[in-house]
Amino acid sequence: MTRYYFIIQIVLVLSQQVVAQSISQWRGPDRNGVFPESGLLKSWPEDGPELLWVNDNLGRGLSSVSVTDKEIFAAGLDDSTEYLSVLDFDGNQLWRLSYGLGGKTSYPDTRCTPTVEGDRIYLISGRGKVVCINSSERKIQWEVPAFEKFHGKHWIWGIAESPLLVDDKVIYTPAGHQTTMVALDKYTGETVWETQSLNDTSSFASPILIHFGGKKIIVNLTINYLLGVDAHDGQIIWNVKYSDIQTPTFHLWAPRNNTITPLYHDGYLFITSGYDHVGVMFKLTDEGNDIQQVWTNSTLDCHHGQVVRVGQYIYGTNWIDNRTGNWCCVDWNTGETMYEKEWYTKGSIIAADNMLYCYEERRGNFALVEPSPDDFKIISSFRVTEGMGPHWAQPVIHNGVLYIRHGNALMAYDLTSSLP
């Protein structure tokens, strides 16, 4: 009996590990912009990697896509309604389902990237409704008007958060006078916990999960605070008023435009925002019960294109104004700026197979870049011509295919074979 019980426990543990590894979400498995790929091309033909297909019927979207081993998931806005589109690997639409109303602010196009685990898809609408869609049944399993229910408060440009799954919980940050962050049961939508209120406004950043000191800590930003929350019970472990750290003298309102997902590695946490507000590195201390500031950097004030860590360096773009920015490299350990280089304008960045993938936001130029602290070394580049609007969506790489979203269009490129 003991032997069989032991076997069952092993099976359960392995099953939980498989489930944990199967989540497809915002900016990759660890939400840090690094995609676990190998065998990708180290240079491209003059016109770029081979374009496999284009689907231009997604609806308007600034959100990225999530890709599983079975399907592709994308959110899009038609008129004032948000839809989930599910595609096969030839770019054909398998099905489509409306799940909520879009935001009422400027740039109302979808911002939330679907979070997919098994046959469940989680989304946050532009008006703060948290939704679970059952892909097997192709219908909404549950929905919670969370922004309304928890009396949330959002900043000027609305809601842009992508939901985080932690164990059996869906995490959302409505902020406001009642709470700051909430956890919903991922199977039912029932409230598991809600944190105390910091009496603040939600940012445009998405949360991450870190493991430190034997704790699971959920980290996110409001417009003023960086906070760490105990994933088990929703207690706020620590918070820091980021907006008070070297507040820009020219753009006094700017520190509240936090769009960058916190970047974590080995006990250290980096945050940044645009408009001349400094990036800050923190160190977790006291078994995760506190954090302390390590360094600041005034060069890499990333607007909304995100940052990525490769080796001991952080890469991303800074903000010069809303139309321009340069490509930067900063030392993870010291905060020293290694370079600041001009290449068209600011944009998005991810990493895979020890290369950087850089997507500038105005003209759609896309580059394969060698990560180096010495220079912004472009190996190959091409231009994205399909779609419409700003090139703000984060690229995704899955099983050797590069997915680029531009407005209503999704393009798939082969990164494993060269054209003859």
Describe the residue ranges of each PLM region.
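Blade/loop signatures of beta-propeller domains
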Residues: 21-50
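Short loop/turn segments immediately following the C-termini of beta-strands
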Residues: 28-31, 77-79, 126, 175-176, ...
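Extracytoplasmic beta-rich repeat domains
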Residues: 52-66, 96-115, 143-165, 177-178, ...
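Short coil/turn segments that connect the beta-strands within blades of beta-propeller domains
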Residues: 69-70, 118-119, 167-168, 214-216, ...
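Structural motif
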Residues: 81-84, 180, 228, 277-282, ...
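Loop/turn-rich, solvent-exposed surfaces of beta-rich toroidal or solenoidal domains
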Residues: 299-371
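Blade-level signature of beta-propeller repeat domains, shared across WD40, Kelch, NHL, RCC1
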Residues: 364, 388-420
